[in-house]
Structure formats: structure tokens, C-alpha cells
Amino acid sequence: GASALLIASVVLTFLYLGERSAGNTAEMLFRADTLWYAPLHISYSVGVDGISVAMLLLSAVIVFTGTFASWRLQPLTKEYFLWFTLLSMGVFGFFISVDLFTMFMFYEIALIPMYLLIGVWGSGRKEYAAMKLTLMLMGGSAFLLIGILGIYFGSGATTMNLLEIAQLHNIPFAQQCIWFPLTFLGFGVLGALFPFHTWSPDGHASAPTAVSMLHAGVLMKLGGYGCFRIAMYLMPE
């Protein structure tokens, strides 16, 4: 599975570069949209640009090496790789999401396995580290959810698609002053920005090697990517 992810990411990178070299100037390439829930205009909407392609390739390399680092992990090897795969799926899904709800869903999918991966297969004060990490990140998720809902209703859009909301550019400045701090705070906790970084050292110290690799190399980058993709992109003022 990890090998397939790495190969797919490399192929996607070359396809993306080929499209750009051919003169394709679309903001997002390889778009796919499927309506999930019509009343709230929730869609499974994915695509890639230069930033997301780079993050996908980085994530694939770390998942690939992390898989080999965990090859002889005991006990409950199958269960470990199940949760490790779910964590990886959340990370990849987050980077390709173009819909606010889809992005938040994959964000949560990436966070939930961390508790078990550290609490069960970690070392040292693993239960304390897992609980602290989970509580702080879920607290950040609550702020993020409020911010996302505020963006959706404040924009007056009939979609949760990031590109379409950005094109409307009609979130009032007064509301941006409310929703931007909430979304920035939500992603800032995951990005371990000061003073919300105290969960990170405990998590690194207690996590298995592969999880610590994914934690430092990819998971924390979700925070910075989310700040750029949602907070700054939709509320530039």
C-alpha cells in the first residue's frame, strides 16, 4: 500500500508538471466533484495545485519509510497498520480537498488515529501524551468547525467549494475579523504554534518511530497548509 501511494504520488507529480508545461493555467487540476448532501451543498470535491502536489509527494515518502520502520512492531501489528493507514488516508485526503466539509472530515480522520497509535503502541508516558494531544487538537477542531461554518454562512454561497467561495469574495470584513482568528487558531493548534505547542513534545517523545515521523513531517504541516488554504485564501483582508 505504501509503495502504491509513493508511486501514485510520483506519477501525479509528473502529470501535474506535464499539464503546466502544456500551458494549462487552471487553478486546480484533475478536479473531481460528487454531490454528497444537497441541502447543505456538501460535495466530495478534490483537486491539486502546486502546493498540494508537493505535500502529497512529501507525505508519500514519509509514509513509505514509516511503514518499513514499523515492519517488526509488536504487539497487534495488523491493528497498528490499520490505524496508520487511516491516519495516512486522512492526510492525503486533506491535501487534495477543495470542499470545506470534505477538508474538515479528512482533518478529523487524520487526528483520531493518533490517540490509539500513541496510547497503545507508544512508550513512556504514552497515555498522558495521547490524552493531552487528543484534547488539545479536538479543542482546536471545535474552533475550526465554528470558523468553517461562519465562512459558509457569512459568504452567502450556495456551495462549500473553496474556489467558488473565493471567487465570490463577499465575506464582510467585520465577519472576517471573527472567522479568521477562529480558523487560524484551530489550525494553529495542530501546527504547534506558540503558545499551543505543549502537546507536541510529549507526543513526539511517546509516539512510535513511524508515527513520530508522520507527526513531525506531515501532520503538523496540515496546520500551516490549512491556514493558507482556508484562513488566508478566503479571508485575505
Model-found features: residue ranges?
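Structural signature of hydrophobic alpha-helical transmembrane segments
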Residues: 48-59, 100-113, 176-189, 237
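Membrane-interface helix caps and helix-loop-helix hairpins in membrane proteins
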Residues: 72-74, 95-104, 234-237
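Juxtamembrane/interfacial segments at transmembrane-helix boundaries in multi-pass membrane proteins
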Residues: 17-43, 141-198, 202, 226-237
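Transmembrane helix-loop-helix hairpins at membrane boundaries of multipass inner-membrane proteins
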Residues: 1-68, 72-82, 157-170
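Alpha-helical multi-pass transmembrane bundles of energy-transducing inner-membrane proteins
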Residues: 19-20, 79-86, 90-176, 209
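Hydrophobic residues within membrane-embedded alpha-helical segments of Major Facilitator Superfamily
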Residues: 4, 55, 62, 86, ...
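Alpha-helical transmembrane segments of multipass membrane proteins
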Residues: 10, 64-68, 89-93, 116-117, ...
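C-terminal ends of transmembrane helices
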Residues: 63-74, 116-125, 191-205
